[in-house]
């Protein structure tokens, strides 16, 4: 079983259920922050490990990037408080604004509907005439970026307010080209589930990446700041082919076929993983 634990508390129950049933499990997208729960899960013979990204570091880096683009007064939109990812991104934003001197005007949490996203942007515009940056640090709202862009455009603010987001989407290129969207961090949607599954499969078939303990891998967020990069992301990450083909997975990630594969193998894979890397490996493949 692969799961995305939005909170640490659910893992204690999941761990017990999987242990009782003799079922291996892994995690994706999230780390475990509660030390007591983490020890309990890591001590389980059925926890294979997983893959998660550096949420705090990504939020910190994107705030620094926006500061470098001239943002001095920032509003932030994030997933609901209590979500592991949201809380870590909050920490990164806090660190970034403290270091750069950006004025954090407002943080809004848990927007799920486009109408609420529009109202939030309009309230920012009305309340903060000094506003010059909006960071979409996380959301489960559909079409969040187009909704933000339309609200800014309707009020004559598109391009005047720098917009950044964590988590790539397929609309970024258009807005980057128009210079109304400015930076995105993401790419984990494609690589985290894949590597979490690979880690679990290796454990289930009896060739774990590391012996006698879970294997957890940290992925780096990728940065996009141009429409050309966004176009390559659309083609090579969201196209017909996965970021690693079945042949690449078999040859480079499944220890059963190559017993030299180890922890360092995966660290090297992540070190080299970029949009340009995927484009180079898959250039000429059928879309």
Residue ranges, per PLM feature:
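Structural recognition of the beta-strand scaffold that forms the well-ordered cores
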Residues: 1-4, 24-29, 48-50, 73-78, ...
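Hydrophobic alpha-helical
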Residues: 1-23, 93, 111-175, 193, ...
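Flexible loop/hinge segments that line or gate small-molecule binding clefts
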Residues: 16-56, 170-173
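Generic structural signal for helix capping and beta-alpha/helix-loop junctions
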Residues: 34-36, 84, 114
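Short beta-strand elements at the ligand-binding edges of bilobed clamshell
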Residues: 37-65, 178-190
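An alpha-beta-alpha
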Residues: 48-107, 200-234
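Hinge/cleft segment of the Venus flytrap/periplasmic-binding protein
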Residues: 100, 195-287
């Amino acid at each position: 079983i692969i799961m995305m634990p939005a909170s640490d508390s659910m893992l204690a129950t999941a761990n017990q259920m999987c242990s009782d049933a003799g079922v291996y499990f892994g995690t994706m997208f999230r780390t475990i922050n509660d030390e007591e729960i983490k020890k309990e899960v890591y001590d389980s013979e059925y926890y294979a490990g997983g893959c998660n990204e550096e949420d705090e570091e990504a939020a910190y880096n994107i705030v620094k990037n926006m500061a470098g683009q001239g943002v001095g007064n920032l509003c932030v939109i994030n997933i609901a408080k209590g979500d592991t990812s949201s809380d870590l991104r909050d920490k990164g934003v806090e660190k970034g604004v403290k270091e750069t001197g950006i004025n954090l005007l407002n943080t809004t949490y848990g927007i799920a509907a486009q109408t609420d996203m529009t109202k939030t942007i309009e309230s920012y515009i009305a309340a903060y005439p000094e506003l010059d940056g909006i960071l979409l640090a996380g959301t489960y709202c559909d079409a969040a970026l187009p909704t933000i862009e339309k609200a800014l455009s309707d009020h004559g603010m598109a391009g005047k307010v720098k917009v950044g987001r964590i988590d790539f989407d397929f609309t970024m290129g258009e807005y980057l080209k128009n210079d109304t969207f400015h930076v995105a961090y993401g790419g984990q949607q494609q690589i985290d589930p894949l590597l979490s599954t690979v880690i679990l499969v290796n454990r289930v078939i009896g060739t774990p990446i590391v012996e006698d303990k879970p294997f957890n891998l940290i992925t780096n967020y990728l940065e996009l700041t141009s429409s050309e990069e966004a176009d390559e992301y659309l083609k090579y990450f969201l196209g017909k082919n996965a970021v690693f083909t079945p042949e690449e997975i078999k040859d480079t990630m499944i220890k059963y076929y190559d017993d030299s594969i180890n922890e360092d193998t995966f660290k090297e894979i992540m070190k080299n993983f970029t949009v340009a890397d995927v484009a180079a490996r898959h250039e000429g493949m059928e879309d």
